[in-house]
Amino acid sequence: IEVPYENVGKFVKEKDPIYDVLAAAAKNFEHNLSDLDASEQVRNYLVNERKISPQISKKFNLGYALKSWDALSQTLLDNGFSEEILIKAGLAKRNKEGKLFDVFRDRLIFPIKDRKGRIVGFGGRVMSQEDQPKYLNTGETEVFQKGRELYGFFESLEDRKNLKEIYVVEG
């Protein structure tokens, strides 16, 4: 049986820009959480209400999506990513007029990693009291299928030598 190596290589290379834009988005979200005055409420929520230390926040690459309709999209476009790749990665959508807008706005962001540690999607908890879903996940994409990934699994692999037990919970 002949194995089509060239096709497999092309398939992987086509996914590379998606992984790249997701990694760039994660860095942007992390920066927003750690360095911006606008995210002070979110930092306080993590530390005071959820008892999540800055060290744990950093380990899991937690971030914050600004309230703006297009802050992330504009940052990523300014860094050379195309509108098409933002949409393919599940980071942006188009409104009825065709204008690009961010999927995640005013949310605490949880990057979801695959078994190799690559960011494949995001979970976001709303921080405002507006009428919207409390949690929002990246939609299905070429690199993210919700049923295939387990949040925190990659991080648990890093710590497995120091753990006696692992609990898997929902919600």
Description of each model-found segment:
Residues I1-K88:
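Non-catalytic accessory segments of DNA primases and related replication-initiation nucleases
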Residues K10-A25, S68-G171:
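Phosphate-handling DNA/RNA-contact segment within nucleic-acid enzymes
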